[in-house]
């Protein structure tokens, strides 16, 4: 287990962003890096995975299936220049310091097994009717250690042999997902059980539908879609890529940086 009393350890964030024909994920990551610096006080490294492929995902903006390249999360262990790392999807907007506080916990790697979708879109908490509990790779925390290296090596093996592992663990969806590979690797590495001591104590908050705007008002986050949602100041997983690639995202980030307290580095 890592020594939490070591003061010389470096901390930082790795954001994975691989562009597609429809979406400039790197541009989204660059705006999120500004939020990371402001709310977490940490440096950011943006990584475009080398292990790529093509999946399709359903777009809440267009109601159609679009290209989705999200394969290389297993590269994070080698890609991170930090001793202690937060891995983020580009579209998980950091709006508080709760992730940084989790570094006070003892762990080799820390996963999120809970997701709260605020606009009522339901997603099962398992990977299939007779499969394992879901894990969200939207945010993952880890420290460099032998246990963590084994975990990411196992994720890479599952990715290479995904058709086999998908059938073995009764995964319903045909698309490869980092979420599924992380869940299976965690289950195997924990002795073929669901070890909850490596789960984060809080959930990821997601807005799954199309978004018109996001703004701050009186210290709260106001998301406008088909109706308005008023949220506490908290990090938010935004599925609307149309919003994230519009000028509205930069305007929202500018508002956050100019009105909310900055965390000391």
Where are these regions (language model features)?
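The conserved acidic donor/metal-binding loop of glycosyltransferases
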Residues: 89-93
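A short, glycine/small-residue-rich beta-strand->loop->alpha-helix junction that serves as a flexible
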Residues: 20-27
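A glycosyltransferase accessory/donor-loop signature
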Residues: 1-15, 26, 131-139, 143-265
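Short aromatic/hydrophobic "clamp" motif used to bind/position activated sugar donors
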Residues: 85
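Conserved donor-nucleotide/metal-binding helix-loop-beta segment in metal-dependent transferases, i.e.
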Residues: 96-128
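Active-site-proximal specificity loops/subdomain of glycosyltransferases
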Residues: 48-80
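Short, polar loop motifs at secondary-structure junctions
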Residues: 46-54, 94-96, 115-116, 199-200
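Short, acidic, metal-binding catalytic loop of nucleotide-sugar glycosyltransferases
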Residues: 31-42
């Amino acid at each position: 287990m890592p020594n939490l009393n070591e003061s010389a350890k470096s901390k930082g964030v790795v954001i994975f962003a691989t562009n597609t024909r429809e979406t400039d994920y790197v541009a989204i990551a660059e705006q999120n890096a500004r939020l990371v610096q402001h709310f977490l006080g940490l440096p950011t490294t943006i990584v475009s995975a080398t292990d790529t492929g093509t999946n399709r995902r359903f777009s809440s903006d267009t109601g159609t299936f679009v290209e989705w390249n999200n394969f290389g999360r297993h590269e994070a262990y080698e890609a991170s220049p930090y001793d202690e790392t937060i891995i983020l999807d580009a579209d998980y907007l950091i709006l508080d310091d709760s992730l940084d506080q989790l570094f006070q916990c003892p762990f080799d790697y820390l996963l999120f097994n809970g997701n709260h979708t605020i606009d009522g879109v339901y997603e099962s908490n398992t990977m299939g009717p007779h499969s394992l509990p879901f894990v969200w790779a939207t945010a993952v925390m880890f420290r460099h250690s032998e246990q963590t290296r084994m975990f990411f090596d196992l994720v890479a093996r599952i990715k290479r042999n995904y058709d086999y592992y998908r059938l073995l663990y009764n995964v319903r969806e045909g698309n490869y997902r980092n979420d599924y590979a992380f869940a299976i690797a965690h289950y195997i590495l924990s002795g073929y059980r669901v070890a909850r001591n490596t789960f984060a104590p809080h959930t990821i908050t997601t807005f799954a539908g199309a978004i018109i705007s996001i703004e701050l008002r009186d210290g709260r986050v106001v998301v406008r879609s088909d109706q308005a949602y008023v949220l506490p100041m908290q990090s938010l997983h935004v599925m609307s890529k149309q919003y994230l690639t519009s000028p509205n995202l930069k305007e929202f980030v500018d508002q956050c940086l100019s009105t909310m307290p900055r965390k000391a580095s």
